């Protein structure tokens, strides 16, 4: 922890650090000259004049302002370390993109969503270096080239056509101006601390300002003859190139009203340059929308189509993103009552907001005879939407009883229409003794329409537009022996980083709500209490079946006594034992399971104390960029004979995809090394992991390839499309995501998991206990055939394994039967050992020789063996099938379902 009172001001004209880096070889315009040099082959002589519209003045002030921005860009680039290929992008579709290592990742490895450390963002002042600009990606970054990229203008226009990038640059007037971009989820983690939203944890740095150059949208639409309002032209829709899983596979798209698009005062541009360079891949290369004063979600990147329509965009992301619904509406209610489609809740313009950036999180201000003789300067940023000027920022040290008006710094001048498109900065000198007597600092801003920020947080299901007073808490501490100081705490830290006063208060609230009864833990010698604190190193020691601890949302649970009762088998717990498995737990467990977890809580995770090298170290004292470096990974051998590594996710590349039927696909994924086998025991399964709509999604699958295949594994997957089954209108989240994957895409795989393992020659290991059978009654429903198929494969591959198999396989229709060709082939070639019987609810084909309806006692009696000490039943299918068809009918036949039925 930095203990310093050098209250340094980072204004936009401050001299840069004495540091320089060589320009990248692929970036000839590293110096950010305006316009870029001809050597880039980027811009030919334009047919219309390029003009700068920074302000309303008509004199040399424009040139002065342009030069000032240029100096800021040069200064920022000179202080910035080069972007690199981040090891965290290895195995993802974004592995070709260079990124700044200090960006804080908010959604794991992929997709890339990030914000800079708040102190680094503020260090650069008004203009943000492009590598530090926050990033919001819904999926992989599309690849494209300048020469091949086209944008289509269509819909209600007289002359629909496509234009190239060279045409955009050379045949249209351009405009260049600084614009602040803000994600509507800025400060969302504060909302997640109150109640979890459906969004990930943005901190307070989802905001950046750069200089954008592009063609005014109104000029483009005029050129192509946009129709009038009377002829139905009411909206302008934008569609990107990125193919995303939402809605069963769709492009990112949204729309704005046509009067916005045609309003010259709104300065809406189709941008192709940022800070004097071509757009970076993460920011929309080669072309994107910039809509000043609007939320970032309306500014479509990698734009491919502009459509003038009567109706607003029908994109999944236009309706299911960027809405502020009333606080009582949760995700379930929003879906059942169609709240997403109510136009009054859409977000367009930004709201008024302000943040305290100095003091930074965990900064310490020593209290002594010297520091108390000079004021301390509080600092921060503020912005508003719609071009409205921030006119006042106020700070309170007494909970809102009194307010002090801050000094404002507006580095931009208004446009000729009086608009302000950028953030501003505020500062206030306060007496140190006043800070010592206060408990918190709070800030609020006002804009020219006299809108201000609410005192209290207003929760909404998407966690959007949080703009309550930003509060920094203060506590007295002892940074050194014989010395006292004030330690400052921000409300949260971005992403999954620990820290912040809201996290502490949440833990205290949960502890107060915990039941008073004490529960004895099997694996720990003490009584369980919610208040006991453990370090991460202590948790890591409990990673075995003898003592299995897990961390979920900062709470520590001893799951040892639940190992034998877990529906997915002990492997499902042990694969995460000794780790923080918050994301994975939330991805695969219901609310009921989350409530059951509380019984096993033994304490809380001890967060990092106040140290000078913490992530939020003060920018006022000595700091090093090393604090932003990712942990150095331990070197491991590059080649392994087995791909799966317990407790780790491995990236696997999609190398082949075949359509077996309209809704069945066979996927082949390459393992990390060509000489590896997957390493999945027969009978167990793997998890496929993907971030879909900003949340981790994990689903269990059993490969259909044999266990000894080298270099790859295969999955046969039924795709559950949206709008097909009335009970599941959105379809299957993971199966639709898989169907949308392009060849070359990567997917994370984790395993092995499961409580059943077939060891050959009729031997099974179930929950660690041996079982044996000469005959197997194999009952499957739908996609539940895959683990049964896997066991059959292993048996038939071993010439010494003479286990008999009797398969009853249920589906809705004949077309839903998976792997039928393979099953029928085995039954035909080895009829004495393999018998297969199908059950379908409805048959539309003539000559159907199998059963109709549902699995019944009569069907089972006819097609599976009678119970005996050498007979086991294996079952996999939907829970209702197991509960209402398999269990009762096997019991009627005399099976001991507790001992002789194995359910995958």
Curated annotation (Swiss-Prot):
The cofactors named for this UniProt entry are: FAD; heme; Mo-molybdopterin
The keyword Oxidoreductase belongs to this UniProt entry's keyword annotation: yes
Q: How is the cofactor bound here?
A: Binds 1 FAD per subunit.
Its top-level enzyme class, in one word, is oxidoreductase
Annotated spans, Disordered: 1-65
Asked if the record carries the keyword Cytoplasm, the reply is no
Q: Which residues bind Mo-molybdopterin?
A: 183
Highest taxon, organism lineage: Eukaryota
> Biased composition, Polar residues: where in the chain?
1-10, 39-50
Q: Which UniProt keywords apply?
A: Disulfide bond, FAD, Flavoprotein, Heme, Iron, Metal-binding, Molybdenum, NAD, Nitrate assimilation, Oxidoreductase
**Which SMART domains does this UniProt record tie to the protein?**
Cyt-b5
The record's section on CDD domains has: cyt_b5_reduct_like, eukary_NR_Moco
Give the reaction(s) catalysed: nitrite + NAD(+) + H2O = nitrate + NADH + H(+)
| An example Gene Ontology molecular-function term | nitrate reductase (NADPH) activity
Q: Where is the composition biased (Acidic residues)?
A: 56-65
What is the protein's quaternary organization? Homodimer.
The record's family statement is: Belongs to the nitrate reductase family.
Protein task? Nitrate reductase is a key enzyme involved in the first step of nitrate assimilation in plants, fungi and bacteria.
Provide the protein name: Nitrate reductase [NADH] 1
The species is Nicotiana tabacum
Q: Lineage of the source organism? A: Eukaryota, Viridiplantae, Streptophyta, Embryophyta, Tracheophyta
């Amino acid at each position: 922890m930095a203990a310093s009172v050098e209250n340094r001001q980072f204004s936009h004209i401050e001299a840069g650090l004495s540091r320089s880096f060589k320009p990248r070889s692929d970036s000839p315009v590293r110096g950010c000259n305006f316009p870029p040099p001809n050597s880039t082959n980027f811009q030919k002589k334009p047919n219309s004049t390029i003009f700068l519209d920074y302000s309303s003045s008509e004199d040399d002030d424009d040139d002065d302002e342009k030069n000032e921005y240029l100096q800021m860009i040069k200064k920022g680039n000179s202080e910035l370390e080069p972007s690199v290929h981040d090891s965290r992008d290895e195995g993802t579709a974004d592995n070709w993109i260079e990124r700044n290592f200090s960006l804080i990742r908010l959604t794991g490895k992929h997709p890339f969503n990030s914000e800079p450390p708040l102190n680094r963002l503020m260090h650069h002042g008004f203009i943000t270096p492009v590598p530090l600009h926050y990033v919001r990606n819904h999926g992989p970054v599309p690849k494209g080239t300048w020469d091949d990229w086209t944008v289509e203008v269509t819909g209600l226009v007289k002359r629909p056509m496509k234009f190239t990038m060279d045409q955009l640059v050379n045949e249209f007037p351009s405009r260049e101006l600084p614009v602040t971009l803000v994600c509507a989820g800025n400060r969302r983690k504060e909302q997640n601390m109150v109640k979890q939203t459906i969004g990930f944890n943005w901190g307070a740095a989802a905001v950046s300002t750069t200089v954008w150059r592009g063609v005014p949208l109104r000029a483009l639409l005029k050129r192509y003859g946009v129709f009038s309002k009377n002829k139905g032209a009411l909206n302008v829709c934008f569609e990107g190139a990125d193919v995303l899983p939402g809605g069963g596979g769709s492009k990112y798209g949204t729309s704005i009203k046509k009067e916005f698009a045609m309003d010259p005062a709104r300065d809406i541009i189709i941008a192709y340059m940022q800070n004097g360079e071509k757009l970076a891949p993460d920011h929309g290369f080669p072309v994107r929308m910039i809509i000043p004063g609007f939320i970032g979600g309306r500014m479509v990147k990698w734009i491919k189509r502009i459509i003038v329509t009567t109706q607003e965009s029908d994109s999944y992301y236009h309706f299911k993103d960027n809405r502020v619904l009333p606080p009582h509406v949760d995700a379930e209610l929003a879906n059942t009552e169609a709240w997403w489609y109510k136009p009054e809740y859409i977000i367009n313009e930004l709201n008024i907001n302000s943040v305290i950036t100095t003091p930074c999180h965990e900064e310490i201000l020593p209290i002594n005879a010297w520091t108390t003789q000079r004021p301390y300067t509080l600092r921060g940023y503020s912005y508003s939407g719609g071009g409205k000027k921030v006119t006042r920022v106020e700070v309170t040290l007494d909970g809102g009883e009194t307010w002090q008006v801050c000094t404002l710094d507006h580095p931009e001048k208004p446009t000729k229409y009086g608009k302000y498109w950028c953030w501003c900065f505020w500062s206030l000198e306060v007496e140190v003794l006043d800070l010592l007597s206060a408990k918190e600092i709070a800030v609020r801003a006002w804009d020219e329409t006299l809108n201000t920020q609410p005192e209290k947080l207003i929760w909404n299901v998407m966690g959007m537009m949080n703009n309550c007073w930003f509060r920094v808490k203060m506590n007295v501490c002892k940074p050194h022996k014989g010395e006292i100081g004030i330690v400052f705490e921000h409300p949260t830290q971005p992403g999954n980083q620990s820290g912040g006063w809201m996290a502490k208060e949440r833990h205290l609230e949960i502890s107060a709500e915990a039941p008073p009864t004490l529960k004895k833990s099997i694996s720990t010698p003490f009584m369980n209490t919610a208040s006991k604190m453990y370090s991460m190193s202590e948790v890591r020691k409990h990673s075995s079946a003898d003592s299995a601890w897990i961390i979920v949302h900062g709470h520590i649970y001893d799951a040892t006594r639940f190992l034998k009762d877990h529906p997915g088998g002990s492997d499902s717990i042990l694969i995460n034992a000794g780790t923080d498995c918050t994301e994975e737990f939330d991805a695969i467990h219901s609310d009921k399971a989350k409530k059951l977890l509380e019984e096993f809580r033994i304490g809380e995770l001890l967060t990092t104390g106040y140290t000078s090298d913490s992530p939020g170290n003060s920018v006022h004292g000595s700091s090093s960029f090393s604090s932003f470096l990712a942990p150095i990974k331990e070197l491991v051998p590059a080649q392994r004979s087995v791909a799966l590594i317990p407790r780790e996710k491995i990236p696997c590349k999609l190398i082949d995809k075949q359509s077996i039927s309209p809704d069945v696909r066979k996927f082949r994924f390459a393992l990390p090394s060509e000489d590896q086998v997957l390493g999945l025991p027969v009978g167990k399964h793997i998890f496929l992991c993907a971030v879909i709509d900003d949340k981790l999604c994990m689903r269990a699958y059993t490969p259909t390839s044999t266990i000894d295949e080298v270099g790859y594994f295969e999955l046969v997957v039924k795709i559950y499309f949206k709008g097909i089954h009335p009970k599941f209108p959105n379809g299957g989240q993971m199966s639709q995501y898989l169907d949308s994957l392009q060849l070359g895409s990567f997917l994370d795989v984790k395993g092995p998991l499961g409580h059943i393992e077939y060891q050959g020659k009729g031997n099974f290991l179930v929950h660690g206990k041996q079982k044996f059978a000469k005959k197997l009654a194999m009952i499957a429903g739908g996609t539940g055939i895959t683990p049964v198929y896997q066991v059959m494969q292993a048996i038939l591959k071993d010439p010494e394994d003479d286990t008999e198999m009797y398969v009853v396989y249920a589906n809705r229709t004949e077309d839903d039967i998976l792997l039928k060709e393979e099953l029928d082939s085995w039954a035909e070639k080895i009829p004495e050992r393999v018998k297969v019987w199908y059950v379908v609810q409805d048959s539309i084909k003539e000559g159907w020789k199998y059963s109709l309806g549902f699995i019944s006692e009569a069907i089972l009696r006819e097609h599976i063996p009678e119970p005996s000490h050498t007979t086991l039943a294996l079952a996999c299918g939907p829970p209702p099938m197991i509960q209402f068809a398999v269990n009762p009918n096997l019991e009627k036949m005399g099976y001991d379902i507790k001992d002789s039925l194995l359910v995958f």
